[in-house]
Amino acid sequence: MENILLRQLENVLCEGMKVPEELRRLYQWIEDNGFYEDREGIRYGYLYPQQALRDSWTDTEREGGTIISFYADSREEQDETVTRYYGNKDEEISSRLCIFSQTGAEGSMGALWLDDEGETRIVHLGSGSGSTMLCTLAQNGLDFLRLLAIGYDEICWDSELPLPPNHDEDELFVNPNLPFRAWVENTFRTTIPELGTEIVTPVQMGEQESKGDSFVEWSNKVVR
């Protein structure tokens, strides 16, 4: 059976860009479990069945672990989005960024970025209206999955990443997505960190100190 999520992404990849193997396997896991919805010709993939998540939501808690949606707009829409984001029409931007996920309800995005050495990295584009985190999310696909398995409500908030999930007793309690966590651990024979900052070094939009993040350095050069 065709993996529609993966085909959508492959159809809009920048030249020279590769889908990390771990992301390919995640998309297959999503398709195999039926964790997707089709709307207006686009397939959206999730880490947890959406109806079950909605049904579990109360004033105090919910199921499902990290909320993130995987999708791929057309290349034309991708180009428009990144041009608007950076305020720059230079092909240097559209030829190196491919948005593949929404990381926050306020519009933050996850993207594949082609670095100067031709390697594909996973980066974060904060919406600016909520999250202002603009940095590398993971150097590789496995670390991205490990980050998702920690169990934050969303991975777009830099203030949350140095702390464990559910550290604030006054906030909604997010029950961990144990099936996804177990799949990551068992499939890749890996462990899940306790804190997001074991993987991510958050950087804010406009911050000139790159903290050794080549994506931040590149973003600071191309933004207008």
Q: Where in the sequence are the language-model features?
A:
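An amphipathic alpha-helical core segment
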Residues: 149-196
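Secondary-structure transition/turn motif
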Residues: 124-129, 178, 220-222
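Structural signal for glycine-centered tight turns and loop->strand junctions in beta-sheet-rich domains
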Residues: 118-120
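Compositionally biased amphipathic helical and low-complexity segments enriched in hydrophobic
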Residues: 105, 113, 126, 162-164
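A structural signal for well-ordered alpha-helical scaffolds and beta->alpha junctions
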Residues: 23, 138-141, 177
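A surface-exposed partner-binding patch
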Residues: 1-116, 181, 189-224
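Compact, glycine/acidic-enriched structural inserts
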Residues: 122-159
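Generic alpha-helical structural element
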Residues: 12-15, 130-133, 169, 173
